[in-house]
Amino acid sequence: MLQSLFKKVFGSRNERLVKQYLQKVKAINALEPAMEQLSDAELAGKTADFKARIEQGTSLDTLLPEAFAVVREAARRVLGLRHYDVQMVGGMVLHDGKIAEMRTGEGKTLMATLPAYLNALAGKGVHVVTVNDYLARRDAEWMGRVYGFLGLTTGVNLSHMPHAEKQAAYAADITYGTNNEYGFDYLRDNMVFEVGEKVQRPLAFGVIDEVDSILIDEARTPLIISGQSEENTALYQQVNLVPPRLTRQKDEESEGDYSVDEKSRQVLLSEAGHEKVEEILTEMGLLQPGGSLYDASNIMLMHHVYAALRAHALFFKDQHYVVQNGEVVIVDEFTGRLMSGRRWSEGLHQAVEAKEGVAIQKENQTLASITFQNFFRMYEKLSGMTGTADTEAFEFQSIYGLETVVIPTHRPMIRKDEHDQVYRTGRERDQAVINDVRACHERGQPVLVGTTSIEANEKLSAELKKAGLPHNVLNAKQHASEAEVIAQAGLPGAVTIATNMAGRGTDIVLGGSIQKEVDAIRNDAALADGEKDARITALKADWQTRHDAVLAAGGLHIIGTERHESRRVDNQLRGRSGRQGDPGSSRFFLSLEDPLLRIFASDRVAAIMNRLKMPEGEAIEHPWVTRAIENAQRKVEQRNFDIRKQLLEYDDVSNDQRKVIYEQRNELLASVEIGDTIRAMRYDVLGETIDQHIAPGSMDEQWDVAGLEKTLAAQFTLELPLRQWLDEDKTLNEEGLRKKILAAADAAYAEKEALVGAEGLRRFERAVMLQSLDTHWREHLSALDHLRQGIHLRGYAQKQPKQEYKREAFELFSAMLAAIKAEVTQITTTVQVRAPEDVQAVELHEEPSNVQYEHAGYDEGADFAAAESAEAAPSGPVHVGPKVGRNDPCPCGSGKKYKQCHGKLA
């Protein structure tokens, strides 16, 4: 109550911020008359003037009013579009590193030119991030005309682009590209063997379009670059025969072999199920008679069984994936788009391929990986824009430190959002949707029907065909024609069925879009200018008639056939209507069979329906029902937020390690001289080897001299007469012997340098170091994956899984660094380098075969949210000998802490 009173008196923080920005807009507007008086050359010359002032120490904030006024005038001259005051406010919000929530159709693309131009003046590069290649290309071409007019360069960064073109795109002042491509380029840059092969500059300023989709929806799906491992794929086909022979439990009390937890997307075998699976596998010859699935030797078999169960019970054709040209292609659950070239990890994709009877591709080994959360947090300054961010404002603030500012609309929003109608069955709901579509079509009102899956999309399309209603279908299968279909969805009486957010980023113009026809007439060289103008005028008059007819019919009507887990996605669907003050309406038709209602609210609503004795085909419609559904969505949103937060906390561990490895790698690439590093590593490794045979401070009688001689010869090709040295010099103590061994190793290495030359040996050292670093890092990523999958089970032992993960991940990392040190020392001391050709042979690094850019599984993170999962995880790496804590004394006996001795690389 006090809070609402405070808001009434002082206004909300959002209102106060917008008021402050509007004061700055007045200053920008005051400059407009002066800008209009400038010639094109004078206006374009402002860019050089701004850059000179920045060099003299003027801040971007000081330049903002003038720079924004320049961009507004340039856009008016080049595109015929003038930035509204609210777009100026949005531009300032983005420049300040915040998120601008701006309604659909309010001109986010044009708004982004303001902060992009201003920040590009600093010369560090600006990245505009979009959700697909089509939007990146469209926006770069469209807005690039404004930047080009003002003397700035624009690049577009697309997938499968040649290396030289990518470098040119990143060298431009402003680069447009997709979130995936920026992330993959970062990972690829950290896999190169020469500095000149890199494409990205340091990450300075990023503007993310559809920021909610990228930083929230896709935050659980890491970007993974992987190569194929040598694994037997026949096992997937054999294990695929197991799930059809098992019985699913209907509920917790009923009998069955396995249960499916839809909330956490897990499949769990019952006791009876375990026994039955063991019987089937024994019968197939995959399990030894009397063997158990829990035997250490059968861990991978267990992994295959669960992958097959998930493929059969949780992933369905035309909903989670489609089969195209003999391949299983993932459907993005948030956008409904096909994700060609992406594969689920952990053997799930192969299990789905086995289920569908298509060729099984080998399982992948992770070469590099990063989450969008950690990638985008590396930008010096980050901002975003979307039509729907307010519901997730807390998450943006807590995870990314980004404040959300709601920008007022240019014109008042008059769309009418009706209450949800809930039906008992999906059949009744579909009939109600068809009746509503028919009514809209007959009165000439365009209608957009949103579905949550391709399966529902095609099913509804078949029903509409049966009812004789003409319509356009838009889902991932029609990806190529997406923008065209959406652009014409505003024609009088048009019926369009689209999956979730297909066509996002393209406006639905009431009366249909005529831009394509206008461009065709303008570009027709056979027509005289007068004829062109006459045709365009006639075209516009015809469009105006259609536009007025649609307005009279009530504008665009939105029908939702199912509530999404997130209110934001529902708001995005609604937001397609009522753009820029246009009329419109929306309604959701639901059934008790929908996943959200079935899991969270069906019993309560069904009880109300029974109590009211509602006949078949009758819907329940009440603000209470709408509120109950929104509460269910809030619960799911909160749970998903908790999962993302948990995942981030786990991923931060590997992210810290990634930073160390990539920093080390970049230093190696940039440095010419790494001889000192190699020498320090050699001394460390030889020191450890000596310690194993001659313990520090031990008596002469305890020394294993013969064993040390043998080890030095075998591992480092150092044939040293240690016994002879000791016999000849009775005063030679442990320290003296150590010095002689290290001196002999240095002398042997100097001989190698004399043979091949200092420059050749440095190149050899660098190549060995890079390859060893990469190989061990890949193995480490795989070990971390295995550790992470089973870590939640530590909760049963009254241990904190997160703390255990941090501790073991550090131990793995320390072991990896020690292994790199040992391997590099062994290779550099044992490999015979006699000529420059030998160096070149080492430098010819083998490129990973069949590299793929992978999309991680949907169920990732469910383990952290629900420790009830009894799924056995693959065994983690085996540790030999006692584990050493980070702050414990180093076992080598140096007296230093482990982290300051053998716990670091060099």
Curated annotation (Swiss-Prot):
Its cofactor is Zn(2+). PANTHER family: CHLOROPLAST PROTEIN-TRANSPORTING ATPASE, SECA INNER MEMBRANE COMPONENT OF SEC PROTEIN SECRETION SYSTEM. GO terms for biological process: intracellular protein transmembrane transport; protein import; protein targeting; protein transport by the Sec complex. It is found in: Cell inner membrane; Cytoplasm. PROSITE patterns: SECA, SECA_MOTOR_DEAD. Disulfide bonds: none annotated. ATP binds at Q87, G105, E106, G107, K108, T109, D507. Zn(2+) binds at C890, C892, C901, H902. InterPro entries: Helicase_ATP-bd (IPR014001), P-loop_NTPase (IPR027417), SEC_C_motif (IPR004027), SecA (IPR000185), SecA_CS (IPR020937), SecA_DEAD (IPR011115), SecA_motor_DEAD (IPR014018), SecA_preprotein_X-link_dom (IPR011130). It catalyses: ATP + H2O + cellular proteinSide 1 = ADP + phosphate + cellular proteinSide 2. The lineage of its organism: Bacteria, Pseudomonadati, Pseudomonadota, Betaproteobacteria, Nitrosomonadales. May bind 1 zinc ion per subunit. This is Protein translocase subunit SecA. One of its GO terms (cellular component) is cytosol. It is a peripheral membrane protein. Pfam families: P-loop_SecA, SEC-C, SecA_DEAD, SecA_PP_bind, SecA_SW. Its EC number is 7.4.2.8. Part of the Sec protein translocase complex. Interacts with the SecYEG preprotein conducting channel. Has a central role in coupling the hydrolysis of ATP to the transfer of proteins into and across the cell membrane, serving both as a receptor for the preprotein-SecB complex and as an ATP-driven molecular motor driving the stepwise translocation of polypeptide chains across the membrane. Gene3D superfamilies: Helical scaffold and wing domains of SecA, P-loop containing nucleotide triphosphate hydrolases, SecA, preprotein cross-linking domain. Belongs to the SecA family. The keyword tRNA-binding does not apply.
